[in-house]
Every structure is written in C-alpha cells, then in structure tokens.
C-alpha cells in the first residue's frame, strides 16, 4: 500500500497564508498551519526521534556499569560512541537516498525498525566485541531517522513557521533523553548493575509500537511527493557534489560547508551527551539518584532550548541563531567543566543553560539543511551532510575518552568547545535560507 496519497494542493489551513490573509502567529500557529496530514507527520517524526533519543542514551547512562562488567578503560568506552556515530553516517546517507527514491514515510519505517531491533540485541551481548557490533548496527537506523523525519515535516511546514516546527520536532530528543534518565534511575536503583544495563537495552523495543501507527496514518507531503516523482534525478550523490557553472549553480560548496557545520555542532554535542553522566558519577561522586537529578536540570534546559531555538531561527535567521548558540555553548562547556569541587549547587544550576544552549543550536538544523537542497536530492543532501558531520564529530567523544585518562573527564570535556568554533567558521561558506519555500 502506498504511503503517499494522490497529489493535490495543500489547503489554506495546511499552509501559512501568503495571499494577504493574516498569518497565524499564535503560540501554536505553526501546529495549526500544518493541517491534519501535517500534524500526523509531525507526531510520527516527533515519536520516532524521541524514541531514537531514548535508545541512544541507554548506552551513555549505562556506561559506568558496562565498563565495570566488561573491564573497560575510558578509551574503550569512548569507542562505543565513535562506532555508533560513524556507522550512523552510513545509515543516514543511505536513508536519505532511500527517502528520495521510495518516499519519506517508507524510509522512516525502515530506520525505526532497524534501531529498535539492534538496541534490544545489545541487551543480549555476551562480551564487549559483540556489544560493539550490535551498537554499530543500531547506528544504521539511528543515523537515518532524524534526516528522514525532519524532511517529512519540513515539506509540510510553511516557510514562515518552519524553524519553530522543526525545533518542536527536535525537542523530542530531550523528551526521549528524559525518559531514559527516569528509567535509568528506577532500574539501577532496584536491580543489580550487572543486569540493569541489559534491562535498559531491552526497553528499547518501545519504537516497534510507533511503527504500526506510522504505517497506517502518516503520508508524504503531496506536493513534495509529486515533485519528487516528476524529477529525472532522485537520490543522486553525484548531484550534491556537482560544482557550479556559469549557467547553473551547483551543490558542491553547500555540501562541503554544511558537512563541516554539522561536524562542529555534533562534535560538541556528543562530547557532552556521552560524557556528562560519567563525569557526574565518577568525578563529582554523585549517586545514581543524584546523577539523574542533575541530568534533569540539563535535560529541562535542553527541551526549552529546542523550542526557543526554533522560534529564534525564524526570528533571527538560520545563520544568526546557529552562530549565537555556538558561542554560548562553548562558553557554557568551559564554565561547567571548571566548577570547583564541592560547588554542587552551582553544578546543578549551570546544567540548565548548558542544556539550553547545546540544544538551541540544533533547532534550526532541520529547516536549514532542508532549505539548502532541492526536492529531488533533499533527502540525499540532508542525510549525507548531517550524518557525515556526525561521523566526523564522533572523533570528539573518543578523543575525550583517551584524554580523560590523563586530564580527567572534566578537563577533557573542554575539548568539545572546539567543535562549536568549527561550526561558527563553517557558516561563512553557506547562504541564509529563511523564508525559502519548499516544493
């Protein structure tokens, strides 16, 4: 059964008015403007990305228990993240091509099923090597879900509201993270660590429930699907690396600088997402409950940061929003990692702005990358640049793991600030796209 309904124009309710009628700029105007089909697509992408986040954080939250169970050093534990992110680049690029060739919803289903199956498999791993392989295979689905879900929603959203809409989708990452932190606190408080980490992975079966609903209720945006079907070129890697000519602009420059931007932002983000739980438990000597409590502040900041960043990217523009929060994120990392021993209240309070800034920078990513590419190669371009950046950014958590043996986790965390500097520089080679319509 096709996941794309017959092509038809979107109604006035499904697009922000552009014919002189007042636009709906209320708090939830962006959601009303999506229309019924768009809201179902939003729900599917929100749920998929939130559960993607939940499955991802089962590992960082269980890292201390895993290291003790398998007798791992910091470098080996950091390798988990690097392998996941590197393989996710392959998965994301392939999912982007798949989305351009067979449709957004079908590709979304493949990614969700993949990461759910291999997350559960991680819970049965008998040794470090097997767990590393399963975690890598999980990355195939993990890499593709965001790119495909973001494109699906972006093609329903109007240019006026696209930043806020995609920022709201991004906020589901914080929801999944919070859910993982709650489950972690409960499971590790009630069950011995040697079994608790396995239970965390087994709960990763939750996304399977989402697949049934998405398969029945969510469809590709009609106008974008029609444009994709008419295009002679679908999902072409050659197209996104084609240099410009005097008569036609190419996409090579966009692809290179967008990949560099993604590298910087994700290098900084995954440094924090991977190592902050370990930092709190090992260097700040917090209990399981204490670590969960401190993470609550950071995750709350992240959730609000996603929503606020989405609003600001529509107000300020895509580039200004990213540049602003790249600077603030770098400052927050340095401040957080250098909090004096014993200043636990300050550590708690600073978790909020750290989570806020490191997430607000992501809010414009979904809309910005989607707007940089034409419909026929949007999935390929967004999937490739976002996930290549994820693979290259994966070097950061591993580097922190090796540096932690001599610098301590807190000192090594500062390395993540370099990523945000790279992101700010990459913006120099990219255009502003706020207000660009997608067809």
Question: Where do the PLM segments sit?
Answer:
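Conserved MFS/SLC helix-loop-helix module at the cytosolic interface between two early adjacent transmembrane helices
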Residues: 90-126
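Cytoplasmic membrane-interface "Motif A"-like loop-to-helix N-cap segments
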Residues: 101-111, 315-326
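Helix-loop-helix hairpin linking two adjacent transmembrane segments in secondary transporters
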Residues: 169-216
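Central cavity-lining transmembrane alpha-helices of secondary-active solute carriers
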Residues: 82-95, 296-308
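Helix-breaking motifs and short loop linkers at transmembrane-helix boundaries and internal kinks
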Residues: 71, 103, 124-130, 317, ...
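Cytosolic juxtamembrane N-terminal segment immediately preceding the first transmembrane helix
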Residues: 2-54
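Extracytoplasmic gate region of multi-pass secondary transporters
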Residues: 60, 249-303
